[in-house]
């Protein structure tokens, strides 16, 4: 909104030209979302406490988690508001990628919000049924996929890019649609599974968003894309502002979510953040790189899948408890140690992913 106002006033005062620069607007997006989260956060937490919107804790989990019962949850709504406001203020709202990324994120937030509400209303940790949750996730993801497929302006926008190999592009055709579904739904649920410790999911989400922001900037810049040997996708660079908003909102939320957490994001935040990372990777055509940068989310998900498969096939469990972070807790690792080590791993994986920009 303010971007369009500044462009309209460009002829009145030349200083408004600065708003045409993507980097400047991204910085504003970071600061705006961060400011909203930090300023509004205490009031949101207080309101959640007053309405007794507290976390329900499983009694079969680590005993140390029982003390978390009653901690305010659904704080992810704060993240979504901060992201939405910052994105709407500083993005080019005529850009289709901005809208598909923002609306997909918010839609998954609504799904997560309904899930959180049912948990609170029913007084247990079950929430929305897995079938219902999966159905609505599929509906939203397919809508985004069909939109991107139908508005694609070149075959590159619906092709799979293989990292490390220059000019290796696999045209997908209609297979692009199920790929988008898999990436968005998979990423959403992976982040949700990871969100089991204080700050464990939010900082890796911020770090991966930062990595994808670099890819988005390069992908949307014809000169950089040509130099780096990656596909040029016109308009994709504009989602960097959204990435900045996510980073700012995430850091602001981490201020209150760091151990010991004053508030949890709930499914309203976790499902939305995962979907955001997934749809961002699709827009910049780096779905395979997302697997690397989001390796912590991938491993957490695989630990659950392996645990379930092993128990059903052999009656034995591979891990003491899944997802993987609970396994380390039950081994005696203090919660902060698990969290920080997962953060460190994510930093390394994001750097590896960024290195693939040049290694071709």
Swiss-Prot record:
Q: Where in the cell is it found?
A: Cell inner membrane
Q: Tell me the pathway.
A: Cell wall biogenesis; peptidoglycan biosynthesis
A GO cellular component annotated for this chain's UniProt record is: plasma membrane
Name the needed cofactors. Answer: Mg(2+)
Which BP terms in the Gene Ontology apply to this protein? cell division; cell wall organization; peptidoglycan biosynthetic process; regulation of cell shape
TM stretches of this protein: 26-46, 70-90, 97-117, 132-152, 168-188, 199-219, 236-256, 263-283, 288-308, 338-358
Q: How does it sit in the membrane?
A: Multi-pass membrane protein
> What keywords does the record list, in alphabetical order?
Cell cycle, Cell division, Cell inner membrane, Cell membrane, Cell shape, Cell wall biogenesis/degradation, Magnesium, Membrane, Metal-binding, Peptidoglycan synthesis, Transferase, Transmembrane, Transmembrane helix
Q: What is its main location?
A: membrane
The record's listing under PANTHER family reads: PHOSPHO-N-ACETYLMURAMOYL-PENTAPEPTIDE-TRANSFERASE, PHOSPHO-N-ACETYLMURAMOYL-PENTAPEPTIDE-TRANSFERASE HOMOLOG
Known function: Catalyzes the initial step of the lipid cycle reactions in the biosynthesis of the cell wall peptidoglycan: transfers peptidoglycan precursor phospho-MurNAc-pentapeptide from UDP-MurNAc-pentapeptide onto the lipid carrier undecaprenyl phosphate, yielding undecaprenyl-pyrophosphoryl-MurNAc-pentapeptide, known as lipid I.
For this entry, the protein name equals Phospho-N-acetylmuramoyl-pentapeptide-transferase
Native species: Alkalilimnicola ehrlichii (strain ATCC BAA-1101 / DSM 17681 / MLHE-1)
């Amino acid at each position: 909104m303010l971007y369009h106002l500044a462009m309209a006033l460009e002829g009145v005062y030349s200083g408004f030209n600065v708003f045409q620069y993507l980097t400047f607007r991204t910085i504003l997006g970071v600061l705006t979302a961060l400011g909203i989260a930090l300023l509004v956060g205490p009031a949101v937490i207080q309101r959640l406490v007053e309405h007794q919107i507290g976390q329900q804790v499983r009694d079969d989990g680590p005993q140390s988690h029982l003390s978390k019962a009653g901690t305010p949850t659904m704080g992810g709504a704060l993240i979504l508001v901060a992201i939405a406001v910052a994105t709407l203020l500083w993005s080019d709202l005529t850009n289709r990628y901005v809208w598909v990324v923002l609306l997909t994120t918010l839609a998954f937030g609504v799904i997560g919000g309904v899930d959180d509400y049912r948990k609170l209303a029913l007084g247990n940790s079950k929430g929305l049924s897995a079938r219902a949750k999966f159905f609505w996730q599929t509906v939203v993801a397919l809508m985004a996929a069909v939109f991107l497929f139908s508005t694609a302006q070149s075959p590159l926008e619906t092709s799979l890019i293989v990292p490390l190999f220059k000019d290796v592009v696999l045209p997908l055709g209609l297979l692009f649609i199920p790929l988008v579904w898999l990436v968005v739904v998979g990423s959403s649920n992976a982040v949700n599974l990871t969100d089991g410790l204080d700050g464990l999911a939010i900082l890796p989400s911020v770090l991966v968003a930062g990595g994808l922001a670099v890819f988005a900037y390069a992908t949307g810049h014809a000169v950089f894309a040509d130099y780096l040997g990656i596909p040029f996708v016109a308009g994709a660079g504009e989602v960097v502002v959204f990435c900045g908003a996510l980073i700012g909102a995430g850091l602001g939320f981490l201020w209150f979510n760091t151990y010991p957490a004053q508030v949890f994001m709930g499914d309203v935040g976790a499902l939305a953040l995962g979907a955001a990372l997934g749809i961002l990777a699709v827009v910049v055509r780096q779905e395979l790189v997302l697997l690397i940068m989001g390796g912590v989310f991938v491993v957490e998900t695989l630990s659950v899948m392996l645990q379930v498969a092993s128990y059903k096939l052999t009656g034995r469990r591979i891990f003491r408890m899944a997802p993987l972070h609970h396994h380390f807790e039950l081994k005696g690792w203090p919660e902060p140690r698990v969290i920080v080590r997962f953060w460190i791993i994510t930093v390394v994986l994001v750097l590896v992913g960024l290195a693939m920009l040049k290694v071709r």
